[in-house]
């Protein structure tokens, strides 16, 4: 139900079980889980489907959309100042994944700390016109060509950073520590 977002559903349990079986690589369990996954995909009771525009999938208005099987909920209204870990109500990973020194002329993205840069190998694995590439990765040269700035003075600089979980204007807390309280949900399992 819409008022119970964040609760594990039967669909989420089936999808997680499928992940476990795949990692176990146990042929004796594959047929059973394949049957359950087929039901998950074809039974309209589950109501999962792809959204038409992949580019908006990681925007906050598409959290828990029909493509989402399971997400970890986060909120920007937590009054957390706890650096100890995942006890925060907000998503502290977001600030770490954002590009350092980023200034966006469109005021969509805000500066992060530049951790976990995207590798060139991952960037190059996408076909040039694949919409998943634009949604997943910020190419710093392309970003600069569009009038933005990004610092290259960071450890392990690659020229690429994560877009789908990049800090965005208006997504962080005005209550607790801003860096610890981004509202971006983590999409654990998508359809």
Feature names for model-found ranges:
Residues 1, 17, 21, 191:
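Substrate-binding cleft of carbohydrate-active enzyme catalytic domains
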Residues 2-3, 118, 174-178:
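Flexible glycine/proline-enriched surface loops and loop-helix/loop-strand junctions
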Residues 3, 10, 184-188:
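Residues that mark the junctions of alpha-helical repeat units in TPR/alpha-solenoid scaffolds
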Residues 7-156:
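An aromatic- and glycine-enriched ligand-binding surface/loop that stacks and positions planar moieties
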Residues 131-191:
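C-terminal substrate/ligand-recognition segments
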């Amino acid at each position: 139900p819409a008022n119970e977002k964040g609760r594990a559903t039967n669909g989420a349990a089936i999808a997680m079980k499928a992940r476990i079986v795949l990692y176990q690589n146990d042929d004796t369990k594959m047929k059973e889980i394949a049957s359950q996954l087929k039901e998950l995909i074809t039974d309209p009771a589950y109501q999962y489907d792809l959204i038409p525009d992949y580019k908006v999938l990681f925007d906050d208005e598409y959290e828990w959309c029909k493509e989402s099987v399971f997400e970890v909920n986060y909120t920007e209204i937590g009054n957390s100042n706890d650096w100890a870990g995942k006890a925060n109500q907000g998503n502290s990973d977001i600030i770490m994944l954002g590009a350092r020194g980023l200034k966006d002329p469109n005021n969509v993205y805000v500066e992060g700390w530049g951790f976990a840069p995207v590798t060139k190998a991952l960037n190059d694995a996408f076909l040039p016109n694949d919409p998943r590439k634009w949604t997943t990765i910020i190419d710093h040269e392309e970003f600069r060509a569009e009038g933005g700035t990004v610092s290259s003075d960071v450890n392990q600089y690659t020229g690429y950073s994560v877009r789908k979980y990049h800090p965005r204007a208006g997504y962080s807390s005005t209550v607790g520590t801003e860096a610890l309280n981004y509202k971006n949900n983590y999409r654990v399992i998508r359809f």
